[in-house]
Amino acid sequence: TVPWEKVRNDIAVVIPVPKDRRSLFVVPWVPKGDGTYRYTYIGTTDTDYKGPVDDPQCTKDDIEYVLNALNASVTTNVTTDDVLGVWSGLRPLVKPDENAKSGRTADLSRRHKVLTSPTGVVTVTGGKLTTYREMAEDAVDEAQKILGTKKKCRTRSLSLRGATGKRWSSTDVDVHLDGRYGSDAAALKSLIAGDPSLADELVDGLPYLRCEAVYAVTHEMAGTLDDVLTRRTRSRLFDRRATRAAAPAVCDLIAPLLGWSEAEKAAQLAHFVDECAREDAAGLVTEAEFIAASK
């Protein structure tokens, strides 16, 4: 993730990676009222990974790969000093055929497969995030076939949660919540009605509200401090240091909902601070630092 001003793309674009037969996505993120955006994110890499599967890390090599490809296609020069945040993940690709011409993961098929064991266990493997619904449909349909029922997966014709047409918003809070949650925003506004302090900022300088941390726990299965500040909101990606400063207060807010002891609160905070420190070590700047350096 980099400040939008470094790229200034008003639409998502696909750019080629020189000498690598791959492409990168360059996507504007978080629209502002003047028609511009706050951030642009760029990716992805496709490299073999041999580390812990439950904690994949974005390496300096990954960052340099993305930036080199970006700089080959834009007129500005984007450096590691401009990188605000990163995230990484793994995808389980189907094992290639023994006669496959290339051993590169980038050349492997992204199609998924549904397998059924002799004992009736249905497994879906391969695929990618953008085809998650189709993958689930195929797996559910296979399970229904094994059970001998005539029902089929219904998600093809169902709207996403919160999708109920355009909503007219009258306040900044309404605009923010309606934009992020759609019709589910009513639940967050109800939280604010019961406790007006939940309309306050979650992290200084970022758009998220305290009610969103509560909602993340009660409605979105957030189970850790990192879940709330990195995955349900994107606070850590947008301003790591401001988020780290807010982490103790956020921890106090969600701890009663999750039944945490003082020892668990301390462990949650320590883990989150360690994650931020790893990004500090990678040389990632915050948005505030980028703005200050640009003046």
What is each PLM-predicted segment?
Residues 1-10, 16-20, 29-40, 44-295:
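C-terminal accessory subdomains/tails of enzymes that are appended
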Residues 25:
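Conserved active-site segment immediately N-terminal to the catalytic lysine
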